[in-house]
Amino acid sequence: MGRDRQGTLVSYRPDIKVLDCTLRDGGLVNNFAFSDEFVRDLYLANIKAGVDYMEFGYKASKELFDVNKFGKWKFCDEKDIRNIVGDNKTDMKISVMADVGRTDFKKDILNRKDSVIDLVRVATYINTIPAAIEMLEDAKKKGYETTVNI
């Protein structure tokens, strides 16, 4: 790490980004049953706060998870995200998480040009890293920013 990237504890570091995962992480507690009003309010609050990325939830397979038992943010359909953000004409980027083995990523993750999503975060365990790499490569080819959570 070069000296030009060093900072003090409280200095501004443009290379550090803030991602709010309230919906995705909180959805594990309430089965993703957030109202559109709550999601929209959180979206607007994150914009005002200068958050870099807002994670809306998962890209989970509707073949593996019952849509009647989970709220829409378990699946993050494009139309549902757009209902909240429109074309997202803000500096904040939109993120979703996809778990290895729990999403049909080739079908459920659209080409970036057809989506308001900017970042796909792939969650994996050590033993499923090869499958995670396949998912990351697919998302990258589709035009997304990508990260991996191990």
Residue ranges and their predicted role:
Residues 7-31, 91, 115, 145-148:
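N-terminal small/glycine-rich loop or linker at the start of catalytic domains
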Residues 19, 43, 136:
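Short glycine-/small-residue-rich flexible loop motifs, especially phosphate/cofactor-binding loops
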Residues 31-41, 124-131:
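Glycine-rich anion/phosphate-binding loops
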Residues 27-34, 68-72:
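A short N-terminal beta->alpha junction/helix N-cap motif
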Residues 47, 53, 58-150:
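Active-site beta->alpha loop and helix N-cap motifs at the rims of alpha/beta catalytic domains
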Residues 1-11, 39-48:
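Short amphipathic alpha-helices and their capping/turn segments at secondary-structure boundaries
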